[in-house]
């Protein structure tokens, strides 16, 4: 768990936000759940699949304390098997980093 940030982020469609906040994050068709180092990284990754994705913040310290493993897989990408709902909170839509991303997306549309 060396050099793993205390918080990581996961993008979801706004329609699926509550499902993930209540049921956690699972890999679906992938082997791993892919987490991002920053809100901006997660927003950019999510924007490929979702219009203005919501971002979930994951408490990695608590997750690791509960016995979950997180791997560093790339410059800004981290992997884990699953994320329990207790470690997930929504990044508010008025978060500064998130609103900057919305501004960039607005210019592209």
Where are these regions (language model features)?
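Conserved NAD+-utilizing ADP-ribose enzyme module
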Residues: 1-109
């Amino acid at each position: 768990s060396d050099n793993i940030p205390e918080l990581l982020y996961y993008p979801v469609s706004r329609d699926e936000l509550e499902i993930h906040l209540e049921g956690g994050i699972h890999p679906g068709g992938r082997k791993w759940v892919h987490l991002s180092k920053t809100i901006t990284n997660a927003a950019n990754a999510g924007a490929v699949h979702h219009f203005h994705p919501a971002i979930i913040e994951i408490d990695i310290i608590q997750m690791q304390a509960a016995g979950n493993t997180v791997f560093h897989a790339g410059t800004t990408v981290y992997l884990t098997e699953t994320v329990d709902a207790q470690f997930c909170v929504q990044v508010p839509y008025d978060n500064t980093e998130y609103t900057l991303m919305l501004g960039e997306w607005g210019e592209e549309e």
